Amino acid sequence: MKFFVPAFLFAATAMALPGSGSAAGVAPHSNNEVEDAVNKCGDGAHMSCCNKINKNEGISQNNIGVLSNVLGAIGSEGLGLGQGCTQLDIPISVLGAAGLTDFLKKNCQQNIACCQNSNSQANGNLVGVAAPCVSFGGLL
């Protein structure tokens, strides 16, 4: 009995301690939110600097229907759609953790967004939503 209590306490303590790595198959989360947003932009889009971000434009909490409040539920401020966006050409040399943040601060004083590479049109698709540029605030 004397051996069981310390062994049980040791095992309980070891199980309660946080792990040092990430779970199998799950990538560890980076501390740099800008770098995370760039990774979320993906291959089918590019980073852009937008003059204006319209947050929750045309979306109200009183909408009724199957898809009501879907866009308003994305992020704390909803989905931000960019207007007047120009593509940012990011050199490979700045892709480090601190280099990317500094590059964006120097080259974009407005809003950073993720824009689709193709022209976005809402005509003829099932949902009828065209979101060419989405602010990083809606992605994080």
UniProtKB/Swiss-Prot annotation:
Pfam families: Hydrophobin
Keyword Signal part of the UniProt annotation: yes
Subcellular location per the Swiss-Prot or TrEMBL entry: Secreted; Secreted, Cell wall
Keywords for the protein's UniProt record, in alphabetical order: Cell wall, Disulfide bond, Secreted, Signal
Phenotype of gene-disrupted mutants: Affects hydrophobicity only when HfbD, HfbE and HfbF are also deleted. Disruption of all 7 hydrophobins leads to altered germination kinetics, decreased survival under exposure to extreme cold stress and increased mycotoxins patulin and citrinin production.
Segment forming the signal sequence: 1-23
CC terms in the record's Gene Ontology section: extracellular region; fungal-type cell wall
Main location: secreted
The keyword Translocase belongs to this UniProt entry's keyword annotation: no
Name of protein: Class I hydrophobin C
Organism: Penicillium expansum (Blue mold rot fungus)
Gene name for this UniProt entry: HfbC
